[in-house]
Amino acid sequence: MQEISIKFKLTNEEINAIENQKKYYEDFRAISIEALKIVQKKRGWVSDQAIYAIAEILHINPSDVEGVATFYSQIFRKPVGRNIIRYCDSVVCFLTGYKRIQIALENYLKIKIGETTKDDRFTLLPVCCLGNCDKGPTIMINEDTYSVLTPESIPSLLESYK
């Protein structure tokens, strides 16, 4: 990660929320995941500039914040669509047919894994497990979980998300 020379500012709301977390932790590095979630909730993703701003508030090295951001798949390091589709690509969902669901999603959305639709409506991401192994294949759209899917069910499901 290159050092960013452009001055970037978090909002007062973001700063206050991050500062509020300090009372719960002795080691401020432990706050980095919460700080990343605070920034992402407001902005939709976490830029390099935000990484440096978080590190400054927490008085830690930016590489520590970057390490946390890149480790957690729920932290987005580039802009994403309004609706995040996560499909489970675990062994169990493989056995229950996730590949057919993945293909149906890609065909309907006209994007590949990791891409966002041209209208910024959807981003398609694989995840290792959604914890719904007895009901696979499973996807999540934002915070909503859908199980026992068929390729034919994908169009009507996606149409309900604007």
UniProtKB/Swiss-Prot annotation:
Which cofactor is essential here? [2Fe-2S] cluster
Name-wise, this protein is: NADH-quinone oxidoreductase subunit E
Give TM regions: none
UniProtKB keywords: 2Fe-2S, Iron, Iron-sulfur, Metal-binding, NAD, Quinone, Translocase
User: How does the cofactor attach, per the note?
Assistant: Binds 1 [2Fe-2S] cluster.
Q: Does this entry carry the keyword Metal-binding?
A: yes
Task: Quote the record's binding site residues for [2Fe-2S] cluster.
Answer: C88, C93, C129, C133
Task: Describe the task this protein carries out.
Answer: NDH-1 shuttles electrons from NADH, via FMN and iron-sulfur (Fe-S) centers, to quinones in the respiratory chain. Couples the redox reaction to proton translocation (for every two electrons transferred, four hydrogen ions are translocated across the cytoplasmic membrane), and thus conserves the redox energy in a proton gradient.
InterPro entries documented for this protein: NuoE-like, NuoE_dom, NuoE_N, Thioredoxin-like_sf
Stated EC number for the protein is: 7.1.1.-
Family under the similarity heading: Belongs to the complex I 24 kDa subunit family.
A Gene Ontology molecular function term of the record: 2 iron, 2 sulfur cluster binding
Q: Which gene encodes it?
A: nuoE
Quaternary structure per UniProt?
Composed of 13 different subunits. Subunits NuoCD, E, F, and G constitute the peripheral sector of the complex.
According to the record, the signal peptide region is none
The catalysed reaction is:
a quinone + NADH + 5 H(+)(in) = a quinol + NAD(+) + 4 H(+)(out)
Sorted alphabetically, which PROSITE patterns does this protein's record hold?
A: COMPLEX1_24K (PS01099)
